[in-house]
Amino acid sequence: MKKFSILLILFIGFINAQKLTPAEISLINQGDINSALPIYQTTDAHQHTTLLNLSTEINPKDPNTAVLVKRMKESLLSTDGGVGIAAPQVGINRKVIWVQRFDKAGEPLEYFINPVITWRSELQNLGPEGDLSIPDFRDQFYRSKVIQLEYVDLKGQKFSEMVEGFTAVIFQHEIDHLFGILISDKKKKEENDSYQAVDAFKKSDSVTR
């Protein structure tokens, strides 16, 4: 009985955690709900902070989630060549993304709720990336060539699939957003890690000589 009570409390806590806050609901429904939501920019201090925050799961069956999904698509379509967008980029720190599926016929845009990468290949590719939230920034990044992905749709149905190539890169980029990871910061970290590795090698080399 005690074990059941603990599980029930955990379940209720999980459900409550997925509930949107009044502020989130207000933002999602502001203005014309059929229009695009503004895309947050790192050049704005408040918006930048939102982009750096961790995102939490969302209730896929909440009617407001459907509105968010729809408006995020409009936001992506309003850009010049954007291939993906994450909820933090429209001010909502929840786990929702849109990705253009270059691995499918017609290259459709598809949404993904509470996406999780459960596996990444060790084999990586180096390729260019930009970001709708970071003006005038583009650089080369390493990403896993293949990933295993799990997610749900608006009905709460669970899916799992393997994705590879450029589409896998987009997924990794957008899911990074859900963890508050921006490619500008990612580049700084990679450069710092590279510097530390080289510096450590030089120190080690000087000792052995």
Q: What are these model-derived regions, one by one?
A:
Residues 4-13:
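Sec-dependent N-terminal signal peptides
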Residues 17-209:
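Positively charged
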